[in-house]
Protein backbone atom coordinates (compact mmCIF):
# COMPACT_ATOMS: atom_id res chain seq x y z
CA UNK A 1 0.00 0.00 0.00
CA UNK A 2 1.13 3.54 -0.69
CA UNK A 3 2.28 5.40 2.39
CA UNK A 4 1.77 8.76 0.73
CA UNK A 5 -1.28 10.05 -1.11
CA UNK A 6 -0.70 10.69 -4.82
CA UNK A 7 0.04 14.35 -5.59
CA UNK A 8 -2.24 16.13 -8.02
CA UNK A 9 -1.01 17.58 -11.28
CA UNK A 10 -0.91 21.29 -12.07
CA UNK A 11 -1.46 23.17 -15.30
CA UNK A 12 0.96 25.97 -14.38
CA UNK A 13 4.75 25.94 -14.19
CA UNK A 14 5.74 27.26 -17.62
CA UNK A 15 7.22 30.56 -18.75
CA UNK A 16 8.64 31.77 -22.04
CA UNK A 17 12.32 32.59 -22.55
CA UNK A 18 13.27 36.26 -22.25
CA UNK A 19 13.71 37.83 -25.71
CA UNK A 20 16.52 40.28 -24.76
CA UNK A 21 14.75 43.30 -26.24
CA UNK A 22 15.80 46.91 -25.75
CA UNK A 23 18.35 49.51 -26.74
CA UNK A 24 21.73 47.93 -27.56
CA UNK A 25 23.66 51.11 -28.49
CA UNK A 26 22.93 54.34 -26.63
CA UNK A 27 23.09 57.98 -27.77
CA UNK A 28 26.61 59.18 -28.57
CA UNK A 29 28.05 55.68 -29.02
CA UNK A 30 30.05 54.96 -32.18
CA UNK A 31 28.70 52.18 -34.38
CA UNK A 32 29.74 50.39 -37.56
CA UNK A 33 27.36 49.70 -40.44
CA UNK A 34 25.27 46.61 -39.64
CA UNK A 35 25.35 47.12 -35.86
CA UNK A 36 22.06 46.47 -34.08
CA UNK A 37 20.88 49.60 -32.27
CA UNK A 38 17.45 48.59 -30.90
CA UNK A 39 15.60 45.28 -30.65
CA UNK A 40 11.88 45.89 -30.25
CA UNK A 41 8.34 44.61 -30.72
CA UNK A 42 6.52 47.10 -32.91
CA UNK A 43 7.87 50.58 -33.63
CA UNK A 44 8.61 52.09 -30.21
CA UNK A 45 11.53 53.72 -32.05
CA UNK A 46 11.40 54.70 -35.73
CA UNK A 47 14.28 54.57 -38.23
CA UNK A 48 15.89 57.94 -39.01
CA UNK A 49 18.87 58.81 -41.24
CA UNK A 50 21.31 55.97 -41.96
CA UNK A 51 19.19 53.47 -40.01
CA UNK A 52 17.37 50.44 -41.46
CA UNK A 53 14.54 48.35 -40.04
CA UNK A 54 14.40 44.55 -40.14
CA UNK A 55 11.23 42.49 -40.51
CA UNK A 56 11.03 42.06 -36.71
CA UNK A 57 11.31 45.88 -36.30
CA UNK A 58 14.99 45.68 -35.26
CA UNK A 59 16.81 48.95 -36.01
CA UNK A 60 20.35 48.69 -37.39
CA UNK A 61 23.00 51.08 -38.68
CA UNK A 62 23.44 51.36 -42.45
CA UNK A 63 26.52 53.59 -42.12
CA UNK A 64 29.35 54.18 -39.64
CA UNK A 65 28.87 57.03 -37.18
CA UNK A 66 27.39 58.02 -33.83
CA UNK A 67 23.93 57.10 -32.56
CA UNK A 68 21.48 59.97 -32.07
CA UNK A 69 18.03 59.69 -30.47
CA UNK A 70 15.51 62.46 -31.17
CA UNK A 71 11.80 63.19 -30.77
CA UNK A 72 10.24 64.63 -33.93
CA UNK A 73 6.94 65.37 -35.59
CA UNK A 74 3.42 66.13 -34.55
CA UNK A 75 3.03 62.78 -32.84
CA UNK A 76 6.28 63.11 -30.83
CA UNK A 77 7.73 59.94 -32.32
CA UNK A 78 11.15 58.74 -31.19
CA UNK A 79 13.63 58.46 -34.07
CA UNK A 80 17.08 56.89 -34.10
CA UNK A 81 19.62 58.28 -36.57
CA UNK A 82 23.30 57.77 -37.31
CA UNK A 83 25.33 60.97 -37.61
CA UNK A 84 28.56 60.66 -39.62
CA UNK A 85 31.65 61.34 -37.50
From Swiss-Prot:
GO terms for cellular component: cytosolic large ribosomal subunit. SUPFAM superfamilies: Ribosomal L27 protein-like (SSF110324). One of its GO terms (biological process) is translation. One of its GO terms (molecular function) is structural constituent of ribosome. InterPro entries: Ribosomal_bL27, Ribosomal_bL27_CS. The keyword Transmembrane helix does not apply. Residues 1-20 are annotated as: Disordered. Keywords: Ribonucleoprotein, Ribosomal protein. It comes from the Bacteria. The keyword Cytoplasm does not apply. Belongs to the bacterial ribosomal protein bL27 family. NCBIfam families: L27 (TIGR00062). HAMAP family: Ribosomal_bL27 (MF_00539). This is Large ribosomal subunit protein bL27. The gene is rpmA.
Amino acid sequence: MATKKAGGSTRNGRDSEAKRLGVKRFGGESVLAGSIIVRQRGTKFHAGNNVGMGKDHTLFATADGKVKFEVKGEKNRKYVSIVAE
